[in-house]
Amino acid sequence: MSSPMPDCTSKCRSLKHALDVLSVVTKGSENQIKAFLSSHCYNAATIKDVFGRNALHLVSSCGKKGVLDWLIQKGVDLLVKDKESGWTALHRSIFYGHIDCVWSLLKHGVSLYIQDKEGLSALDLVMKDRPTHVVFKNTDPTDVYTWGDNTNFTLGHGSQNSKHHPELVDLFSRSGIYIKQVVLCKFHSVFLSQKGQVYTCGHGPGGRLGHGDEQTCLVPRLVEGLNGHNCSQVAAAKDHTVVLTEDGCVYTFGLNIFHQLGIIPPPSSCNVPRQIQAKYLKGRTIIGVAAGRFHTVLWTREAVYTMGLNGGQLGCLLDPNGEKCVTAPRQVSALHHKDIALSLVAASDGATVCVTTRGDIYLLADYQCKKMASKQLNLKKVLVSGGHMEYKVDPEHLKENGGQKICILAMDGAGRVFCWRSVNSSLKQCRWAYPRQVFISDIALNRNEILFVTQDGEGFRGRWFEEKRKSSEKKEILSNLHNSSSDVSYVSDINSVYERIRLEKLTFAHRAVSVSTDPSGCNFAILQSDPKTSLYEIPAVSSSSFFEEFGKLLREADEMDSIHDVTFQVGNRLFPAHKYILAVHSDFFQKLFLSDGNTSEFTDIYQKDEDSAGCHLFVVEKVHPDMFEYLLQFIYTDTCDFLTHGFKPRIHLNKNPEEYQGTLNSHLNKVNFHEDDNQKSAFEVYKSNQAQTVSERQKSKPKSCKKGKNIREDDPVRMLQTVAKKFDFSNLSSRLDGVRFENEKINVIAKNTGNKLKLSQKKCSFLCDVTMKSVDGKEFPCHKCVLCARLEYFHSMLSSSWIEASSCAALEMPIHSDILKVILDYLYTDEAVVIKESQNVDFICSVLVVADQLLITRLKEICEVALTEKLTLKNAAMLLEFAAMYSAKQLKLSCLQFIGLNMAALLEARSLDVLSDGVLKDLSEFYRKMIPAMDRRVITPYQDGPDISYLEVEDGDIFLKEEINMEQNHSETMFKKAKTKAKKKPRKRSDSSGGYNLSDIIQSPSSTGLLKSGKTNSVESLPELLTSDSEGSYAGVGSPRDLQSPDFTTGFHSDKIEAKVKPYVNGTSPVYSREDLKPWEKSPILKISAPQPIPSNRIDTTSSASWVAGSFSPVSPPVVDLRTIMEIEESRQKCGATPKSHLGKTVSHGVKLSQKQRKMIALTTKENNSGMNSMETVLFTPSKAPKPVNAWASSLHSVSSKSFRDFLLEEKKSVTSHSSGDHVKKVSFKGIENSQAPKIVRCSTHGTPGPEGNHISDLPLLDSPNPWLSSSVTAPSMVAPVTFASIVEEELQQEAALIRSREKPLALIQIEEHAIQDLLVFYEAFGNPEEFVIVERTPQGPLAVPMWNKHGC
């Protein structure tokens, strides 16, 4: 990798570099991009091309999330915009559909509301990309969102807390109620549902809520007095409510201080809805209502009616008799013309506005009817606020010079809004001071501001500009209007033609169809289309296989199985069956099984001992076996072949002597032999007997049978019908009425499906033969045949030789009783009514998890359908993650589409933070497929960029680490590079308890911390490594977990171990002396699997030779490179044979050697017994252990017959015997007995210096069987021979240990786990940078190899 160009600095602005960087971003992999950016230019992350795009912009556009996160960690500016369109990286990632990159940017603080040059934010881009089939209409199912100060509980959230942004009124969404109109007032709110029901909430004094009392309602409550009336419109003011029904009736309730209710005689208040009945309204159809604080307005197509306090807003003059209030509805005479046809009416506290179909707008105020505008055609909505009331009319409630200025808003079908204000007394069209065009679909008005809803579902809040403003503000307005791409010809006369409105976008409004506000502007409501409106990916439930499963149970029934509990012998055939299935379908069989063997009252059936499986055996007489088989087929499957049109039954109706031996004997007994028969032929005798038999049959035949002259005795359909009646199967008998046997085949004339009988746990409870027990102790008696037929899980459990099949105790299921009940109900009824009716999403998810575990596919699909119906903006991300985790594919697809359709709302609410990286990737792919325009948004890789083929996959990580450590000294930099080289080959950990992983053997580092002995390139072959019984393959080393990697740094801190290295003698490698290792103080003997420091060998030519063990600190220990190893091996080879000590014993350096290599070393040691007397050695060879029994999973402990204490004593004697002449210092040990208590291992970064200043590790040297750090001073000749008795004793000990381990109770294991966790907390093991603490169980000795034993053999 070449270094950056010499003329490149941190302020580089080279266009060539920018093009190279962007080219690599478009065509390189993530690691290649990282490597190139780290090496090509010092300013690669921020350098821009001619369009103002930098690497961050292109990475976001291409969806390279790994590079994006890498750049964010580098601290690049995330808010920088390009020159072309003013887009940030967030704009670009949304435009190209990379939601995973969007979420990374949002997590790092990028705002969604930053606008580009066209005034579009990132959310606006999502809105513009919405699929074309998504259109929001007033007729859609809608949800109510409210916000405001909520002083009087008018928002319906159940609390008095204020809301700063729109929040869902969840009462309606939970109940499936859709609202089409909301009216907000000071003390209460009114909600009208699409089904015509009225709900109110707020303060109830005066009866304004209409519930029959004056209690306050925190959440919306149904007005029961209007049940049975389909309401079409509501209006409300401060103290009363007006409701219009579809049939033109008007109901009012609330305070009637000003006679605004229109009820005669006028009550002071009315707390239930009462209909307005006036003679002026007879024969009139009211089409609309409106309400102000002091009055109520009704109108038809031809006239307007008002009632209430007459302060000038009723459209009539003062009463000359001094009547201040109009009690009954009175028509406005000023609007009583032949040509007037009313279309819209609105009212405020002090004014009334009427609109005709001709476009004339009239204002009723100050006891006058003024025409404010004309020819305003196609108006869809009109609003009014403010107004002045005559103070003298009611001084108690009115203030002198009170009221506000009148403002009228009108919206036409094209979305244009017109405004009339008493300030300028002219109707002006509104212009929006907003960077882009907006198209209005609904408006709302209060005394301070205007609220808008656009056709794209957005919400805005608008305010009038001040009359007096600075010149700079005027310039800003004009520039904003110019940017809105609208006609600017009005600018010269802007003050007189247009009303200027400054807009502010509402948050969390993305599907709005309607908006409303209270008159004071304190509380607001917005109706948004249901987020599932455009969802078409709906899960489907597969067809039922209920009867097919029971048919399979019947076909697989056998005399020897353990599922059937009754057998029927019909003729010479046996039919194994199941009592519960027969008894639940037939009262005959239910009584038979209740008789307990007493069959005297049953004809043609009796009990006979038991069958081969020990079940009850019943003999059925006078029934054809094939007929009984068809009967069983119908019982189990609700159908049979005789109900299939065109079926040709293959049934032998002629009596077989073998099958009906008893019947034949009875016929023979009836034959009369006379003396006259001696002279007759056999045929004549037979013919006479047949005639006699026929006559007897006719005599014995009942009279009722004479009617069925055309029923043949050989008709199989009638025979089956007779059998069905005999065994009380009326359903089959009635269905066979429409079946005929013609031309040797079945002809179905009329299909009679009948009523399908549902199974139930409560039916025939005396036949329950298995009990399920839930995890909370609740028991469910069940029937084994149903469980085995419906679920393979129970079939495998109860039909085999498992202990559950024969146990009389309840079967404990690790499932809660509520969930287990749903599972069992589904198995019996093939339905899940509880799931369909449940509103608890968590419960349904729990059932889905259990259904997935038990492989109940159809129940899982039912849960998916139920969860899809309960998808909301709050739980969509959670359900998507849940569906991905449990492979609920249909639910996942629905969640993906739901999130894609509501992407703007979910991004603004930050609801996607629960998604994992993989699920976010899937969401990005689905979102790009969902948007058709994404197919054209493809960034073509630049072809003219630099060649990056030389960059390897790992280069990005290498250069990242190099850049981080660039300012460190040279030695530390080289140290890091050596570490990354060692990390190039990935390591894998084995999950087994012992043995090596193949990748660990092949990819192990060339040096493990101690210098190799032997010849150059003397590396064991793979078979030798796998089959060697040397100390290196000792089971105590076991898994690769016990062999710490030299580059393993995270969380480990250990003291450094220093030892003196004697100068080379004749080019030989250094040999270490036991004197150089200082004994540690008070160090306990550690576990075998404790982390061990791995020494690293570095030769320092400028100072005295020394070796330092690797420290498990955040800085990785140095690793001996290949060149050093080759030099050492070369020096060894020059020296000749393996060096020997003056003791005549072989020096082992911890390398795992084969048996052949050990023999060669031993021979070399005997031959070369001189020349090395000046050297001191350290013996690191572990104690020899027998070969493990199982080569694939070797035991973690030694299987030697000697105890650990024997080894210590033996080693101590050996060291003592040579201490005088060898100058080898003894190493003290403190052994502890193995116990159940956990051991704590500390790897401290603060070592204890020895007398000579050397740091000694806290880790023991000889207690661990690790081949790198263990030693053995026992010569092979001193090992005692292994006897057969010791082997047998050892095997018995291992068997006993295995039994103890296997029968260890779960409670004890849990206690130990709690103890381990408590110790970890006590010793501050978590997040401790100074110490690495391990708490583990101590081993209890070797265990025998587990063996599978099959019972019953």
UniProtKB/Swiss-Prot annotation:
Tissue expr: Expressed in DeFew, HEK293T, HeLa and in Jurkat, MC3 and NB4 lymphoid cells (at protein level). Isoform 1 is the predominant isoform expressed in all examined tissues and cell lines. Highly expressed in hemopoietic tissues (fetal liver, spleen, lymph node, thymus, peripheral blood leukocytes and bone marrow). Weakly or not expressed in other tissues.
MF terms in GO: protein kinase binding; protein tyrosine kinase inhibitor activity
A UniProt-annotated Pfam family: RCC1
Biological processes per GO annotation: negative regulation of protein phosphorylation; release of sequestered calcium ion into cytosol
Biased amino acid composition, Polar residues: 992-1001
SMART domains membership: ANK, BTB
UniProt domain BTB: residue ranges: 564-644, 768-836
InterPro entries registered for this protein in UniProt: Ankyrin_rpt, Ankyrin_rpt-contain_sf, BTB/POZ_dom, RCC1/BLIP-II, Reg_chr_condens, Signaling_Regulatory_Domain, SKP1/BTB/POZ_sf
Phosphoserine: residues bearing it: S990, S1004, S1030, S1033, S1039, S1045, S1054, S1083, S1111, S1113, S1116
Positions of the UniProt region annotated as Disordered: 970-1001, 1134-1155
Each RCC1 repeat, start to end: 141-194, 195-246, 248-301
Protein name in UniProt: Inhibitor of Bruton tyrosine kinase
Organism annotation: Homo sapiens
